[in-house]
Amino acid sequence: VVFSLVQSATGTIADTGAIIEAAARHDAFTLCDATQAAGVLPVDARLFDATVCHTYKWLCAPRGAAFLTLSERLDAQLTPLQAGWYAGDDVWQSCYGPAMQLAPSARRFDVSPAWQAWIGAEQSIGLFAGLDIAEVWERASGLGDALCDALGIPQQHQAIVSWPDASGQDLGKLIAAGIRASGRAGRLRASFHLWNDESDVQSVVTALRG
């Protein structure tokens, strides 16, 4: 069962408990994409058989750095089909072939790193590792609810706030005001993170009503 912890277009948070329960009834594995969650919403990778996560979203790292986690149950059943030299038990003995001994751990799924991306990722991930992500979520989703209140729409309790904007009129107003937002699946999508505050909520409201 493959799902995104946070849906990209709407910011809706998946009901992980229900998904895990349904998967267990059918003896199915679960794979959770945490790309739209890690860095703003607490994520416990131990709940799932696999998680995948790119770091260029809420973790604010350069493109090219990503993570995979595997449960012991799933790890025991998987073998990479196109393993590169970095998946070898001894990477420096795995450069030229023709034979290679795969790493016995999940490192056998590693690929050759995008070196420059990981230099940047080390700094940003280090920053987030020192934060209380529950507090980050409380702050970001609180700003999202403040925007909902100001716009007169139901609170969504999310860091990503979205509403119907099929014509793109609202998005155009925000862009014209110098506010970065996006249009996804016929909806306007606005989000809040560490560097946002109440003044940003007011800026969005002013631009939409101007």
Question: What kind of feature is each model-predicted range?
Answer:
Residues 29-31, 50, 160, 180, ...:
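Structural preference for beta-strand elements that scaffold enzyme active sites
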Residues 47-93:
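Active-site PLP attachment segment
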